[in-house]
Amino acid sequence: MKKNIGLIGWRGMVGSVLVERMICENDFFHFNPIFFSTSQKNSKGPTINGEYFGVLKDAYDLDILKELDILISCQGSDYTNKVYFKLRDIGWNGYWIDAASVLRMNQDTVIILDPVNSNTIRESIDSGFKTFVGGNCTVSLMLMSLGGLFSEKLIEWITVSTYQAASGSGAKYIEELLMQMGSMYTEASGYLGNPAHSILNIEKKVRNLSCSDKFPKKNFKVPLAGSLIPWIDKKMRNGQSREEWKIQAETNKILSSNKDILIDGLCVRIGALRCHSQSFVIKLKKDISIPEIEQILLNHNSWTKVIPNRKHDTMTELTPAAVTGTLNTPVGRLRKLNIGQKYLSAFTVGDQLLWGASEPLRRMLKFLI
């Protein structure tokens, strides 16, 4: 018998990508979907593969929610906080799959990334776990690209610098980034290509605009286009941002590490739209050759591609422009550092909305249906 599965937040950015992937993989043929809304209950629901799925249900109606076998939420932490615990309190024993961060570190929650921790997921289902949550986007993308080194237990510690896309903050942030880009172009467009105007004068006009009150920065609070923001999320007591804290904490939970792998670094927002990039310095436990490392990385999963450490390959295949909209999680710039043969550099790229958010949720369903 097909399971009844509720989808909440399916029209948002992550939810839309999730539904798109589910259609692409013919997932909707394998269960009965019920679509919910937090703001437009009783509105017309979607038609998928020629089948109309009825009006939207109220996402806050516990009586409807509690009748379902599985709930998938891409609605965010506020919704999870309002609904999840109430559902559990009234005895709902179904599976909760969530993209939000609020439940990740709870003891009764499993962080899901099946190419990395499928055994943990299966064991948790057998043990009665009911809550499965996607990981932080940078963590999931790092583990996809560097998974072979983790699975072979070759890593002693990692330092990382992230280059995170606007999509990690949400849809309105992507829109604001594009508005900033458009505003800068409008300011400069009348002068570009005109030899009578020096590029320094044009740059000054754009710079003055970006520092003015006219510049669109309601969400970011500061310019991102033509700039960057070296801080993401709240401040922790030790001086880390919460985004930086998540990397070590979530990685070791996903890996079920007996001894924590030490990971730290700086998380930076840049003007990419939906692809996160990361630069790593990795201390290996032993000296192994670059060809061996490349083979270990390639063997881990079918989405990881090793990009040769050459300028043309790197510029054409190891960028957000090359990776956006794909499930590829390439890794490149692999070389030993001058400080020692156990020290490895690496650079990775991955789509924040796919492996960084929606794809682990979609694949989790395979374990449950």
From Swiss-Prot:
Q: Where does NADP(+) bind?
A: R11, G12, M13, V14, T38, S39, Q75, S167, G168, P195, Q352
Keywords, sorted A to Z: Amino-acid biosynthesis, Diaminopimelate biosynthesis, Lysine biosynthesis, Methionine biosynthesis, NADP, Oxidoreductase, Threonine biosynthesis
Pfam families membership: Semialdhyde_dh (PF01118), Semialdhyde_dhC (PF02774)
Q: What GO annotations for molecular function exist for this entry?
A: aspartate-semialdehyde dehydrogenase activity; NAD binding; NADP binding; protein dimerization activity
According to its UniProt record, the EC number is 1.2.1.11
| Functional note | Catalyzes the NADPH-dependent formation of L-aspartate-semialdehyde (L-ASA) by the reductive dephosphorylation of L-aspartyl-4-phosphate.
Describe, as the record does, how this protein assembles with itself and its partners.
Homodimer.
Which class of enzymes does this protein belong to?
oxidoreductase
What is the protein name given in its UniProt record? Aspartate-semialdehyde dehydrogenase
**Which lineage?**
Bacteria, Pseudomonadati, Pseudomonadota, Gammaproteobacteria, Enterobacterales
Similarity-based family: Belongs to the aspartate-semialdehyde dehydrogenase family.
